[in-house]
Amino acid sequence: MEIVSTGNETITEFVLLGFYDIPELHFLFFIVFTAVYVFIIIGNMLIIVAVVSSQRLHKPMYIFLANLSFLDILYTSAVMPKMLEGFLQEATISVAGCLLQFFIFGSLATAECLLLAVMAYDRYLAICYPLHYPLLMGPRRYMGLVVTTWLSGFVVDGLVVALVAQLRFCGPNHIDQFYCDFMLFVGLACSDPRVAQVTTLILSVFCLTIPFGLILTSYARIVVAVLRVPAGASRRRAFSTCSSHLAVVTTFYGTLMIFYVAPSAVHSQLLSKVFSLLYTVVTPLFNPVIYTMRNKEVHQALRKILCIKQTETLD
């Protein structure tokens, strides 16, 4: 595909190149990623329905988990439809549409960064201060944290989008990614994007490194607390759960940090797309499995839901 400049004319749309350099795999990719998208929606919807329908799951840990699942559904849905379109035909998106996609995806991803930190802190309180936990994480506290994470995401990315919206784009209009990636998007501006870039860098450092540091600190203290428990099945289960949670969290935060805090670390655009898949597709796919893997309460609620559905089908 030839990339051409449009000169000094203001462009009205962008072309998302996606995986344009391997057209022979487009149909296979379409099938695979459609299946993955369906699994993401179903897996996360089951978690939400289980938490809403089961009185036993009306606890902070599960309220946070349901919100995480909702975030995963929304921000994956902000990206994947255009990616799937690119496997079948040339995917175009208007400048306004690109701004909207970046705002929705960025806001939800920022909210997820903050929510993951809240979830780690919640587990720290539950494990290290079990007697005081009901007071430390009461209904007003955990609902306030949920609302704060959502609002913070939209406020932070709303500021960035307001700055980007002032830029002028006059070509080229090709984005070598499967979604409107911020760095590539503002890199195409023919007006000075430095204010938007510096602002994004500062906000990214704040919204990524601080929550990630809180997560690492929380899990470190959890590990110390677990080490005091006599060796046995419960201790092994706790370590297994912590390690699986950290694996998902590290993948999510690590790829975002590479993109928005140290973008020069990615020298290959193909590698950039692979990293993008990790936090746009892989993490939302595995979050429901990882966070409910050893949870009997969630398993019981899910079995109840599936049995009800099966009974209704038979009737």
UniProtKB/Swiss-Prot annotation:
List UniProt keywords, sorted A-Z.
Answer: Cell membrane, Disulfide bond, G-protein coupled receptor, Glycoprotein, Membrane, Olfaction, Receptor, Sensory transduction, Transducer, Transmembrane, Transmembrane helix
Q: Note whether Disulfide bond occurs among the keywords.
A: yes
Coiled coil, from the record: none
Q: Which CDD domains has this protein been placed in?
A: 7tmA_OR11A-like
Q: Which cysteines are joined by disulfide bonds?
A: C98-C190
Membrane-spanning residues: 28-48, 57-77, 101-121, 141-161, 199-218, 239-259, 273-293
Q: Which residues lie on this side of the membrane: Cytoplasmic?
A: 49-56, 122-140, 219-238, 294-315
Sites carrying a glycan are N8
Q: Cellular location of this protein?
A: Cell membrane
Q: How does it sit in the membrane?
A: Multi-pass membrane protein
Q: What does this protein do?
A: Odorant receptor.
Matching entries from PANTHER family are given as:
G-PROTEIN COUPLED RECEPTOR (PTHR24242), OLFACTORY RECEPTOR 11A1 (PTHR24242:SF378)
The similarity comment for this entry is: Belongs to the G-protein coupled receptor 1 family.
- Please identify the protein, giving its name as recorded: Olfactory receptor 11A1
Recall the taxonomic lineage recorded for the source organism.
Eukaryota, Metazoa, Chordata, Craniata, Vertebrata
